């Protein structure tokens, strides 16, 4: 069964994570992806190990580069630039994350290529845009810090913390994918290609959703709340007799069900806790009262009982446990491609599902 993007050729000039993640998603959906790499060196993430796959590739590289072939092209030479131009002019989509202006100096900028190939969709990924922020380095950690994510993440005030993965890169890769698909749809109708531009800072600000909306619409600058939610309570990690448990109450009915199961139904009518705004205002004392009740049993027993009462509740899993959970639910989270286990494409399409045709490519000798 062919994928929905069969017949689309993607020239992938991107490196590291945001761009390669986007192009892998396109490849999973059937596009042919040709990854351009520096001869003898390749994508920097080829050297980002351990850990390594059984084939000796860094798992970082392998995680975002399946369903691609690779081509070694030295973009510093006229011959390499000519070869890259030929590839670009044959492609439907070009994806790049060079510093603004770099590809223009090689004769591979959008304006020059679009003049020769009006149907080309040219996706540029930067850290802070192509204007005043063009010279700022687009590193995920830097954007997490400068873009406000670390200011709302961490155990408490004065302890800003980054996310455990390069989340901004991943979100930006998703935005790039959406932009490319929208541009392909427009080309289907009009025959015209266009430039797609995404940047890490704008992607992060968009992904901050409710926190960002609270600032732009109400002027509220949020702070660090640990694992708590700024707008609803109780919605946090709670200690039990043996290990932590997540409880996520989203409305008054769930709160009533929770406290009945904990043996303290009177809390549902207490003025300090009867409504969500009241619970948010008294979140710390509420957490202390709930943890005193939760201390009477272990996490497994409480999860069984609280979930049975219709209240969202669950353990804090490590990755091994998370993948085991997905397997137990029939989600098939792992697919092995040419001997390399990779995380399965997350979107299920009933008529044109993702396909897995090539494992992460080895760097060609020349």
What are the roles of these predicted feature ranges?
Residues 33, 71, 196-198, 313:
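Generic structural signal for residues in well-ordered beta-strands
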Residues 1-42, 85, 97, 115-116, ...:
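Acyl-CoA thioester-binding alpha/beta core of soluble enzymes
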Residues 74, 96, 198-201, 247-249:
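Active-site-adjacent beta-strand anchor residues
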Residues 157-165, 188-204, 223-230, 271-274:
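Conserved Rossmann-fold dehydrogenase catalytic segment
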Residues 59, 204-206:
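Substrate-binding strand-loop-helix patch
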Residues 1-189, 289, 336, 358, ...:
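N-terminal helix-loop segment corresponding to the beta1-alpha1 unit
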Residues 187-190, 264-266:
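Short helix-capping/linker segments at secondary-structure and domain boundaries
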């Amino acid at each position: 069964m062919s994928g929905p993007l069969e017949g689309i050729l993607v020239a992938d000039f991107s490196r590291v994570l945001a761009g390669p993640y986007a192009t892998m998603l396109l490849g999973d959906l059937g596009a042919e992806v040709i990854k351009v790499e520096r001869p003898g060196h390749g994508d920097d993430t080829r050297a980002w190990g351990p850990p390594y796959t059984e084939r000796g590739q860094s798992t970082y590289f392998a995680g975002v580069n399946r369903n691609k072939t690779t081509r070694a092209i030295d973009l510093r030479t006229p011959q390499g630039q000519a070869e890259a131009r030929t590839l670009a002019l044959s492609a439907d989509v070009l994806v790049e994350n060079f510093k603004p202006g770099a590809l223009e100096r090689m004769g591979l900028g959008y304006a020059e290529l679009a003049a020769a190939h009006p149907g080309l969709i040219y996706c540029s990924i930067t850290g802070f845009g192509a204007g005043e922020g063009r010279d700022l380095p687009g590193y995920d950690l830097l954007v997490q810090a400068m873009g406000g994510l670390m200011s709302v993440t961490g155990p408490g005030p004065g302890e800003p913390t980054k996310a455990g993965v390069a989340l901004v890169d991943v979100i930006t890769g998703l935005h790039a994918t959406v932009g490319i698909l929208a541009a392909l749809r427009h080309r289907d109708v009009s025959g015209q290609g266009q430039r797609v531009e995404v940047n890490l800072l704008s992607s992060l600000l968009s992904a901050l959703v409710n926190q960002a909306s609270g600032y732009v619409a109400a002027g509220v600058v949020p702070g660090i709340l640990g694992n708590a939610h700024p707008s609803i309570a109780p919605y946090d990690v709670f200690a039990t007799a043996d290990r932590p448990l997540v409880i996520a109450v989203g409305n008054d009915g769930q709160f009533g069900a929770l406290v009945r199961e904990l043996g303290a139904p009177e809390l549902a009518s207490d003025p300090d806790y009867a409504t969500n705004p009241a619970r948010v205002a008294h979140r710390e004392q509420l957490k202390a009262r709930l943890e005193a009740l939760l201390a009477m049993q272990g996490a497994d027993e409480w999860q069984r009982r609280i979930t049975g009462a219709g209240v969202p509740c669950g353990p804090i899993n490590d990755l091994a446990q998370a993948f085991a959970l997905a397997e137990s639910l029939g989600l098939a989270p792992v697919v092995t491609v040419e001997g390399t286990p990779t995380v399965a494409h997350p979107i299920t399409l009933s008529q044109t599902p993702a396909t897995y045709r090539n494992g992460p490519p080895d760097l060609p000798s020349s």
